[in-house]
Regions:
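Juxtamembrane interface at the cytosolic side of transmembrane helices
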Residues: 172-198
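Aromatic-rich transmembrane-lumenal/periplasmic boundary elements in polytopic membrane proteins
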Residues: 2-107
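Short, aromatic-rich amphipathic segments at membrane interfaces
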Residues: 147-170
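Extended, hydrophilic extramembrane loops/domains of integral membrane proteins
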Residues: 100, 108-150, 160
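A general structural signal for well-ordered alpha-helical packing
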Residues: 64, 163-170, 179-183
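Hydrophobic alpha-helical transmembrane segments
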Residues: 37-46, 162-173
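Short, surface-exposed loop/turn motifs that are enriched in glycine and acidic residues
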Residues: 57, 155, 171-175
Length: 198
């Protein structure tokens, strides 16, 4: 059961580092904050229709203070970006660089798409110098390649209610298994001890 907790913690850390939008959706976090808490129990507001409207995303929630920052960045005061932050960019990433906006990432993704088409054409025509230049553009923008397939900001946002409730259900089941196996282990150990002393 310790492995379940360690695995869950490691997964939360990796998601935070590599997929901040997924983490924000898992927590229903629209506005990022420092010292972000982990939602233990919450009910999403069905009137929340857009990532940038002023509707409170929760009808109610109970948070464990600062736990999301701790799990995601190993720092209780770390900034955890919300959905709006991931789309707008401008916040500081763990490596010290500034997060790009969705529009900038999309622009770079489209640049990589065009460079790939130009690279293929240059190769087929035997223009090796041009092909090498296009290959450099592709490599420089490769990490944004997928963004070039998206049309608008909302395309980047997963289904928040589905993601939120499924994530919290998974955590609840994981917690249940930890408790269940701890109780079984306790009673099994106690029985062994009683048999040993009898």
């Amino acid at each position: 059961f310790i492995l379940i907790a360690v695995s869950g913690d490691g997964s939360a850390y990796e998601v935070t580092q590599k997929q901040p939008m997924k983490l924000a959706a898992m927590e229903g976090l629209y506005e990022g904050k420092e010292g972000a808490g982990l939602v233990a129990v919450g009910l999403l507001n069905p009137k929340k229709e857009a990532y940038n409207d002023d509707v409170n995303p929760y009808l109610f929630k109970i948070e464990i203070p600062k736990l999301l920052s701790l799990m995601g960045y190993r720092n209780i005061n770390a900034f955890v970006p919300g959905i709006k932050d991931v789309i707008d960019g401008g916040y500081t990433l763990p490596d010290g660089s500034t997060a790009l906006s969705f529009q900038e990432k999309r622009k770079r993704g489209l640049l990589a798409h065009k460079a790939l088409a130009d690279f293929q054409q240059a190769k087929s025509e035997g223009r090796d110098t041009d092909a090498a230049n296009f290959e450099t553009i592709i490599k420089d923008n490769y990490s944004y390649f997928g963004y070039g397939f998206l049309e608008k900001e909302e395309d980047l946002i997963p289904n928040v209610p589905l993601t939120f409730y499924m994530f919290h259900f998974m955590v609840m089941v994981g917690g249940y298994f930890i408790l269940f196996f701890a109780v079984v282990w306790y009673f099994h150990s106690r029985k062994k001890l009683e048999n040993f002393t009898a």
